[in-house]
Amino acid sequence: MQICLIDETGTGDGALSVLATRWGLEHDEDNLMALVLTPEHLELRKRDEPKLGGIFVDFVGGAMAHRRKFGGGRGEAVAKAVGIKGDYLPDVVDATAGLGRDAFVLASVGCRVRMLERNPVVAALLDDGLARGYADAEIGGWLQERLQLIHASSLTALTDITPRPQVVYLDPMFPHKQKSALVKKEMRVFQSLVGPDLDADGLLEPARLLASKRVVVKRPDYAPPLANVATPNAVVTKGHRFDIYAGTPV
């Protein structure tokens, strides 16, 4: 995959070329999307819209830390949707990991989550965020146990993941109407990089075959059900709904 690669660390230790080799990235000086290694983290920038700033994965501080400490925990919609109850903490495959927010919420309340991400740039961002999270004194211990990254396409990986999870979680890219600055910033940068998930409808059936209990699909409230397969079961929030489908018992 071609992208502009920029090293702002000033160390000259070749870390960026090692990273490029690992994720199969090729430097393209003219690419509008840039993957930038800063002294603090790896980030994605849209070079023709510098005001958007960089997008990076941070499990330790910022919004994720606030959500972990002060969010709803088990009461969050995604936790309810995957079926967390009492001692039951399902094993989850998040087949559309993105920046890992929902996966992190589930891991923080006790679920073991395997994140799938097919885009190598997004996978590199996730891997960088995980490395910093694993090294953190406060959350590193449980994060290593509960949150892992698999760089693979969900369309193929969903057929051969072992052991089978109890829940498969899907949150395919869908054009957002919301006007919040954060959504606009991230969606604009993200959609410039990966585009819409045009093959997302093909995920539902393999997900249902893989999950032993249920499949949860996050949709904006105005979006049709995935693959146009309606379900009466959903957890509904202000702007989204989490459609719930039966899996395939072991």
UniProtKB/Swiss-Prot annotation:
CDD domains cross-referenced by the UniProt entry: AdoMet_MTases (cd02440)
Gene Ontology cellular component terms for the protein in this record: cytoplasm
Catalytic activities: guanosine(1516) in 16S rRNA + S-adenosyl-L-methionine = N(2)-methylguanosine(1516) in 16S rRNA + S-adenosyl-L-homocysteine + H(+)
Record keywords: Cytoplasm, Methyltransferase, rRNA processing, S-adenosyl-L-methionine, Transferase
Main location: cytoplasm
E.C. number(s) listed in UniProt: 2.1.1.242
Annotated residues for binding of S-adenosyl-L-methionine: 101-102, 117-118, 153-154, 171
A GO molecular-function annotation: rRNA (guanine-N2-)-methyltransferase activity
Pfam families in UniProt: SAM_MT (PF04445)
Disulfide topology: none
Locations listed in the record: Cytoplasm
Stated role: Specifically methylates the guanosine in position 1516 of 16S rRNA.
Family indicated by similarity: Belongs to the methyltransferase superfamily. RsmJ family.
UniProt name for this protein: Ribosomal RNA small subunit methyltransferase J
Natural source organism: Shigella dysenteriae serotype 1 (strain Sd197)
